[in-house]
Structure formats: structure tokens, C-alpha cells
Amino acid sequence: MYELGDDVRQIDWNVYARTEKVYIKRYLDEREIKVHIYLDCSNSMLIENRKWKRAKELAGALSFLALSNDDWISLHCMGVHHQKCFMKKGSRDAKAILHDIQELSLDRTGEDGISFFEQVGKGVRKKSSVSFILSDGLESLSLIEEALRKLSIRREMVYFIQLLDEEELTPSYQGDVKLLDSEKHKETNVSISPSMVELYQERLLYHNKEIEALCNKWGFGYTQTSCLPPLNEIFFKDLKENGWIR
């Protein structure tokens, strides 16, 4: 949020056009930035190994960039009963955080899931310069809205990266199948037709658009990606073109 004395040349006019609120552009390469990264470790992120692998890659790349610029990062692994938090500072910790993320193992077979966004909303932490949310966003909009609202109170810049697997975007299932609720471990027998897939995609699109609208409401950044694009394309094309990094 703009404060008296800030450089008016750094006002983000794109955000102002959407929200009529004046925010100052923040970049990861400004000095002494404090970065919070909220990594969704709930069961839905682990169903497809591709999605969990890509989420860790994104968390590692963001952490490495911040630490290489001699900044602070706090990586919060949420959506689990026993939360983990890695706090690092400066380039000396850049390799260590990559090792920590690589070693994250979350085998929770048979364990009921808990809400990632509920934990984000309940967390009371010191204000940071920038916060990143890495999540599939597959939770109720009310929980997502409440978490984002609480983050907005701290008047920091928040970037939401919604990561979905291709199978979630374009399901390949047809006919009689057994579906498993990844959070509650309940099975349901269904007959999947093309019209059902189309209805699912319409509802998913609506859900994702609502998340984007919530981000716009508070002047937060939002982007959606999948596991298919190369990591460098997501990182240096999507994020850079959005002005999140430079």
C-alpha cells in the first residue's frame, strides 16, 4: 500500500485500475525483502505426483531467488496436522533451502486432510514485504476469501499461484469409475459422460474465476498454471510478464 514518502513512480497503476487502491510495486530483488511462501501440502496436492513435484520446484525457485538477493524467507508448509516452517536468510542458505524442499516427504496414507487456507488464515505472523501462495485452490471459496482477507489487513503484496494438474483441468476418465475423495478418503461410484466432464469444467472455471476476482478485490496478483510448461517458462515468462519479478 502506498504511504507518504514512497516513490510515486513505483505506483502500480494496473492494480489501481482494478481496485481504486494505491499500491507500490514490489520486486523480489529489492534489498532486505521479507518473503513468506505458503506451500499447500494438503492431500489434494499429493494425489498426482506431478503437481507436488512442480509445487516444490516453484517453492524452491522463489526461495532461491530471494535468498540469492540476501533477503529473508519463511517457507510455511500448511494443510497438514504437523506444520513445518523453514526460515532462512541470505545467499549462504540458498542451497540449504533447496535441499530442505527436496526432502519434503508427506506420505499421509489414510489420514484425513485439513484445510490449507484455514491454516493460512489462522496463522499470526509478522508483516512481510511479499507473500506467495502456492496452491491448487481446491477448497471452498469462503475459506479462501477469509484467508485472503486476513492477509490484506497486513497491507502487504500477495501473489497467488494456482497450480492444477492436467487431469484436473481436462479429465480423461470415461464410463463407470470409482472416485476417491483425497481429503476424506471416501469412495464414490459414478458414470462419467462427456456432458458430465463439460459440467465439471464449467464449475472449475467458475471457481477459478472467483479466486481471481478475490485477488483483484484486494490488489493481489493471481496466475494459474499447470504441470506441463517448463519451469523456466512459468518462472521467467508468466511471473516476469506479470511484473512479479524482474
Question: What kind of region is each of these model predictions?
Answer:
Residues 121-129, 141, 146-246:
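Von Willebrand factor type A / integrin I
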